[in-house]
C-alpha cells in the first residue's frame, strides 16, 4: 500500500493504516492500524469495528480486533485486526474468547464470590 489511508474512529481519535495485506489462502484481510487519541482514552473495540466497517465496506460480524496495544500516557495505540470473507472461515480460525470479546459478551466462569462460603 503506497499511501497511508486515514480512518476516523471517533471525534477524538483518528487512525492511519500502516499495513493492509490480503491473505487469499485463509480468506481474510490483515490490517495494522495506528490510532492517535491524544487527551482521551483508548478507543473501544466497538468504535474500532464501526470505523473499519465504514472504511472497508464490510460487515460487523466479519471483523475481529486481534490486539490493542497502548503505551502509558502516549495517546497512541497499535491495533491488529482481521476482516474475513465469510463467517464460517472466521469461526474456524479465530478463538472463541476473541469473538466474545468483540461482541461485548463475557464468558461466565464457574464458582461464586462471597456466596455460600462467606461467614455472616
From Swiss-Prot:
Q: Does the keyword Ribonucleoprotein apply?
A: yes
Q: Which UniProt keywords apply?
A: Ribonucleoprotein, Ribosomal protein
| Region annotated Disordered, chain positions | 101-120
Q: Which domain of life is it from?
A: Archaea
Pfam family membership, one: Ribosomal_S24e
Gene3D superfamilies membership: 3.30.70.3370
Any one GO molecular function term: structural constituent of ribosome
Kindly list the biological process annotations in GO that this record carries: translation
Q: Does the keyword Ribonucleoprotein apply?
A: yes
One cellular component term (GO) for this entry is:
ribonucleoprotein complex
Instruction: Say which family it is in.
Output: Belongs to the eukaryotic ribosomal protein eS24 family.
This one is known as Small ribosomal subunit protein eS24
